[in-house]
């Protein structure tokens, strides 16, 4: 599990995320789209790469991380980057990954959903801020050998429930 200090068992954790810069469009040219590597510990952007479009984020991840030497680092990224080639590239440089599985990997998602999650103990946390209450429940399993994804060691199930809190003294 990742801690607030931005390390997992002493390893640095880097989040990769892409954002389109709002209000930066010039004439007919689309707004710039940037892919950034963020240090979980400090919140600092370590490097960023301009990409031609969102579809180009996948190969841009390698260009982004290459100068950072991902050896020993845990890289987190959204579902767009849940690609076998990306996982192999990170592991091939001695890094580790934590990737989200969604419908862009239908077979992998179906495989993971079929695991015996109801038999797995869970842990939950609750955060309250900005008038919302968010409960996250996490379950973890060792990845079965037959899960077809490079170097997968562990799989997690994260469920999030968000409720809006009523201001005191007001009815909804």
PLM regions and their residue ranges:
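Active-site- or DNA-interface-adjacent structural scaffold in DNA-acting proteins
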Residues: 1-27, 91-94
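Short, conserved catalytic/metal-binding motifs centered on acidic residues
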Residues: 15-19, 37, 43, 61, ...
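Short acidic, glycine/serine/threonine-rich loops at helix termini
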Residues: 25-28, 85-89, 109-113
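Electropositive, glycine- and tryptophan-enriched low-complexity nucleic-acid-binding patches
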Residues: 27-72
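A short alpha/beta connector and helix-capping loop motif
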Residues: 30-33, 84-102
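Short, ordered loop/turn segments at secondary-structure junctions
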Residues: 50, 80, 102-104
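Conserved PLP-enzyme active-site core in the AAT-like
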Residues: 58, 67-70, 81, 87-91
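An anionic, glycine-rich sequence signature occurring as long contiguous blocks
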Residues: 96-172
